Amino acid sequence: MFAEYGVLNYWTYLVGAIFIVLVPGPNTLFVLKNSVSSGMKGGYLAACGVFIGDAVLMFLAWAGVATLIKTTPILFNIVRYLGAFYLLYLGSKILYATLKGKNSEAKSDEPQYGAIFKRALILSLTNPKAILFYVSFFVQFIDVNAPHTGISFFILAATLELVSFCYLSFLIISGAFVTQYIRTKKKLAKVGNSLIGLMFVGFAARLATLQS
């Protein structure tokens, strides 16, 4: 399938893409957190931010920016530390709000929803490892002798985005159903938010110590 477009072993790629999407990460956690705290609208806005951010990174990977980042340690470190700082900021903000017992529902909906999208977009864009991963993973399934490798890259990127959409939709719908139950269990919600905040701090520490 898609061999005429320079895609090799598409079904193997699809299985690999599914397993990759299932691996927990900050983007997934952010979408799940917002689907629980802000419902399906908040979850899908977070997912849209992730999709757009990933699409930009995939395009940059295809355009050769990944090679530039990999061969320029200073540039890699700048993006890496920005990403780590942002993850730490998000984690600290969640922990602070949880400890203070702030009620996010008291805020107006539109600013909150706009912030969700922006945070998800920034979260996705400030991950230098993602752009390097796209190149190293995609190149295994592209026929370099094909006349239009850009089409091959697009097919692989679109497939990954579709798999991600299906998985995140499952999380969003599940999170929305959990929302009503969580709202009646304030202690449980507080523990859950604290764990999410700590996980973001952990992701920040891991990203800060990664090497190119």
Swiss-Prot record:
Q: Does the keyword Transmembrane apply?
A: yes
Q: How is its activity regulated?
A: Leucine export is inhibited by the proton ionophore carbonyl cyanide m-chlorophenylhydrazone (CCCP).
Location relative to the cell: Cell inner membrane
Write out the entry's keywords from A to Z: Amino-acid transport, Antiport, Cell inner membrane, Cell membrane, Membrane, Transmembrane, Transmembrane helix, Transport
TM stretches of this protein: 12-32, 49-69, 71-91, 122-142, 153-173, 188-208
Question: What's the family?
Answer: Belongs to the Rht family.
What is the name attached to this protein's record?
Leucine efflux protein
Q: Which organism is it from?
A: Escherichia coli (strain K12)
